[in-house]
């Protein structure tokens, strides 16, 4: 408050009446005397005012004038007794819209709105329509809100922003009451001084910077949700990050390095930093408003009015009002600076409402759009510019580091091109964890394989984690490995491309004709490791693999076959190797005498599968005494069976008996529940034993893997305790028989024939059994041919041409009936 100027209030000596009228006209003005002022009387007495007072000259009327504080602290209430009667006020005070009353009311209203927004964000999510549930995909900044797929779920950025705004306005309200109380004690009302003292508080400056940051981030996330194209999402994200960073820097400098009453209005800027801070705030607000209005115009069919949701017009009005607040107050700052004494509080809560209400508006628009398009074509919008986000095939197969040594510690880089190296996806945390586990287990298993042990463990671990790698043998000597490595260097690019296709292939070109399932890139370039399961009918749809190098031994090929690690697969390898040694005793076509060319990793063809079924039936009926299903001499067959099953009689009987009991074409015969339970228990026991041995040998020092397995086990136990598995054993069971399959009569005929042969009757010759030489059940020559260098074509599958006609089946049935009748007839004397 400005001090009073020294002037003469009371004349020193009375003069004439003319002089008195002149001085009265000059001094006829009421004067406000502030507190702690001193009045000096003519006799030298000094009077100190303990409270504000008013001096009334002699010309003043009897009525008491009103005391109104002006900008300088003094206000004159001049009264001319000749012209007017009554109190008169000067125009030196602030207008009402710039006084303390509108400021206090605006602050109270914005505080209530801020807390209302917080309550809206924390209430229970709800859905607007039954079929209008919006699913936003995975969590993340560029993928929407909380990611739960329920309308009403809010992102945490909006919650934090609304909460910080409510806290900031609460602090501003408390400071405003303190300053207003001080002014009331002095009898003053200064709105600008009140606002400057409140906004220049240190606590409010800090919380305001934090609140503004979260507000801009929440608005950026809302904009990202509006546009579905990934390119637009990325552009919005990085543009918003840049503008928010600059705004944060300049706002901090403006608050702490350039404090002052003239740094908040455009017309009173004296430095560049306050102007830049105001410019970035205005740019963020205007850009957000422009993009939201553009989105509403694109969705004008649902945005402003819809018959299924008539209150959407109210939400649209609130959204437009909240996003236009920065533009409106920018115009007011330029035109009427005094009017916006309380505009900062409105901008504050308007930014929070612009994010929350617009999010609600967008959810309603998407709900209406999904409800209307629910019966349309299923799928996802694909844009032309999204190819830029696809991963290149070269980037997904990074070369192994030179510091990483090979399985035998030689440290060479032979596997860097993709033939034997480890391959994981770039940027995938799960892939990196799996690769670390695979590295430890692969190194330990390779050390064991160098000593000629754990073939099953080695190939099971590799087949379960990687593609097929034919150069990682189990029982190959060092010389053979060097030769193989030297040979592979000559054909490295083609072999690498053939054996290691990219995990994420590029988008195929649009095809004008239907896609051929046999003429695809996957069938020509992918090598699959197939695990044989007795309950599935495996058909080979892969093309011919190239013949392996001649350095590969028989033990290596047998090790490649063993990919499942079960006793059944081990016995399968032995049964494959056994007939090769007895080919000289049985006649076969010239094609059958050829050496088995490709390894048995991928080849489980149709003839081989049928041969396995037939051999399993023969082994089951004869309890391991017969090896070749098409042997002509029973004595020779028994001799061969004794030689082949001498070392593994018990394992073969158990494995093949289990396989025969679980074959799918034996569904026509009645099987008891005990047999099924026994087979399942045998298989589970063998798998559990193999798993225990594998974990005990390869993962002994893999502490991280063991800790993760322990955590998973404990989590499963806790989940079972919280939500136990429902008891389904007591529920009624209805057995629905399967429909008759094509070839069921043939299978039944074969089973009856095998049962008669197992009961001790002489076995008919192959020329008397036309059915057994059919393509459905291959003979020994066909079985050898299926493993030879001429495999079946990828276009071959089960069709009607491979199934014998009903006439042949009936003829075979009559022939078998006549033979059985002849055999049962007593011999003639």
UniProtKB/Swiss-Prot annotation:
Compositional bias segments (type: Low complexity): 634-653
Periplasmic side: 1-34, 125-159, 255-272, 333-338
Membrane topology classification: Multi-pass membrane protein
An example Gene Ontology biological process: cellular response to pH
InterPro entries listed in its UniProt record: PalH
Predominant localisation class: membrane
Cytoplasmic side: 56-103, 181-233, 294-311, 360-829
Record localization: Cell membrane
Annotated Basic and acidic residues bias: 604-615, 692-702, 716-726
UniProt-annotated stretches for the region Disordered: 1-23, 389-522, 537-702, 714-829
Compositionally biased region (Pro residues): 502-512
Cellular component GO terms, alphabetical: plasma membrane
Compositionally biased intervals (Polar residues): 776-796
Transmembrane segments: 35-55, 104-124, 160-180, 234-254, 273-293, 312-332, 339-359
Keywords tagged on the record: Cell membrane, Membrane, Transmembrane, Transmembrane helix
Annotated family: Belongs to the palH/RIM21 family.
Biological role: Required for the proteolytic cleavage of the transcription factor RIM101 in response to alkaline ambient pH.
Protein name, UniProt field: pH-response regulator protein palH/RIM21
Species name: Pyricularia oryzae (strain 70-15 / ATCC MYA-4617 / FGSC 8958) (Rice blast fungus)
């Amino acid at each position: 408050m400005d001090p009073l100027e020294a002037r003469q209030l009371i004349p020193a000596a009375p003069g004439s009446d003319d002089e008195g009228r002149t001085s009265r006209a000059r001094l006829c003005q009421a004067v406000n005397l502030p507190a702690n002022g001193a009045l000096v009387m003519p006799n030298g007495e000094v009077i100190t005012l303990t409270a504000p007072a008013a001096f009334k000259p002699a010309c003043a009327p009897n009525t008491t004038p009103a005391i109104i504080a002006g900008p300088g602290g003094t206000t004159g209430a001049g009264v001319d007794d000749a012209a007017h009667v009554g109190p008169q006020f000067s125009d030196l005070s602030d207008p009402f819209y710039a006084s303390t009353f509108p400021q206090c009311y605006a602050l109270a209203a914005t505080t209530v709105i801020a807390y209302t927004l917080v309550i809206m964000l924390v209430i229970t999510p709800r859905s607007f329509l039954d079929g209008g549930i919006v699913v936003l995909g995975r969590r993340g900044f560029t993928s929407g809100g909380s990611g739960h797929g329920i309308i009403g779920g809010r992102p945490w950025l909006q919650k934090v922003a609304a909460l910080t705004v409510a806290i900031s306005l609460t602090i501003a309200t408390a400071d405003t009451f303190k300053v207003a109380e001080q002014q009331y004690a002095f009898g003053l009302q200064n709105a600008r001084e009140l606002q400057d003292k409140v906004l220049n508080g240190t606590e409010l400056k800090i919380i305001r910077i934090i609140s503004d940051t979260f507000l801009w981030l929440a608005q950026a996330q809302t904009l990202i949700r509006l546009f579905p194209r990934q390119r637009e999402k990325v552009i919005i994200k990085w543009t918003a990050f840049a503008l928010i960073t600059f705004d944060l820097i300049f706002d901090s400098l403006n608050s702490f390095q350039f404090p002052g009453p003239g740094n908040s209005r455009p017309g009173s800027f004296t430095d560049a930093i306050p102007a830049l801070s105001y410019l970035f705030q205005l740019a963020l607000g205007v850009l957000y408003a422009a993009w939201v209005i553009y989105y509403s115009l694109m969705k004008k069919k649902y945005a402003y009015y819809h018959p299924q949701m008539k209150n959407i017009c109210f939400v649209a009005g609130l959204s437009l009002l909240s996003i236009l607040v920065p533009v409106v107050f920018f115009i007011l700052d330029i035109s009427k600076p005094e009017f916006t004494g309380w505009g900062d509080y409105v901008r504050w809560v308007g930014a929070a409402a612009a994010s929350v209400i617009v999010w609600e508006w967008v959810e309603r628009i998407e709900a209406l759009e999904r409800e209307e398009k629910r019966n349309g074509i299923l799928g996802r919008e694909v844009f032309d510019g999204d190819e830029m986000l696809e991963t290149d095939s070269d980037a997904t197969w990074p070369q192994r580091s030179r510091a990483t040594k090979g399985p035998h510690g030689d440290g060479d880089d032979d596997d860097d091109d993709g033939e034997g190296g480890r391959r994981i996806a770039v940027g995938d945390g799960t892939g990196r964890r799996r690769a670390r586990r695979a590295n430890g287990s692969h190194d330990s298993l390779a050390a064991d394989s160098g000593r000629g042990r754990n073939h099953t463990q080695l190939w099971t671990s590799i087949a379960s984690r990687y593609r097929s790698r034919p150069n990682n043998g189990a029982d190959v000597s060092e010389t053979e490995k060097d030769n193989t490595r030297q040979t592979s260097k000559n054909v490295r690019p083609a072999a690498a491309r053939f054996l290691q296709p990219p995990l994420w292939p590029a988008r195929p070109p649009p095809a004008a004709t239907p896609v051929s399932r046999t003429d695809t890139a996957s069938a020509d370039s992918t090598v699959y490791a197939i695990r044989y399961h007795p309950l599935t009918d495996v058909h080979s749809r892969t093309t011919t693999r190239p013949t392996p190098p001649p350095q590969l031994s028989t033990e290596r090929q047998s090790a490649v076959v063993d990919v499942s690690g079960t006793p059944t697969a081990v016995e399968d390898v032995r049964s494959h190797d056994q007939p090769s040694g007895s080919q000289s005793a049985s006649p076969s076509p010239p094609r059958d005498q050829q050496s088995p060319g490709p390894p048995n990793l991928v080849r489980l063809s149709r003839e081989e599968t049928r041969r396995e079924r037939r051999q399993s039936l023969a082994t089951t009926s004869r309890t391991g005494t017969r090896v070749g299903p098409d042997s002509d001499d029973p004595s020779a067959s028994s001799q061969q069976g004794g030689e082949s099953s001498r070392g593994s009689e018990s394992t073969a009987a158990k494995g093949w008996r289990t396989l025969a009991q679980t074959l799918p074409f034996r569904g026509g015969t009645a099987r008891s529940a005990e047999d099924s339970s026994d087979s399942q228990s045998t298989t589970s026991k063998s798998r559990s034993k193999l798993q225990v041995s594998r974990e005990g040998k390869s993962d002994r020092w893999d502490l991280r893997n063991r800790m993760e397995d322990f955590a998973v086990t404990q989590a499963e136990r806790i989940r079972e305790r919280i939500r136990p598995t429902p008891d389904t054993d007591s529920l009624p069971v209805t057995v629905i028989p399967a429909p008759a399959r094509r070839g069921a009569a043939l299978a039944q005929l074969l089973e009856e024939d095998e049962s008669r042969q197992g009961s001790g009757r002489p076995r008919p010759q192959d020329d008397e059994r036309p059915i057994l030489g059919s393509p459905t059940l291959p003979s020994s020559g066909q079985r050898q041919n299926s493993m030879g260098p001429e495999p079946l074509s990828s276009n071959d599958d089960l069709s009607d041409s491979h199934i014998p006609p009903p006439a042949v089946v009936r003829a075979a049935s009559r022939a078998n009936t006549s033979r059985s009748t002849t055999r049962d007839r007593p011999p003639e004397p």
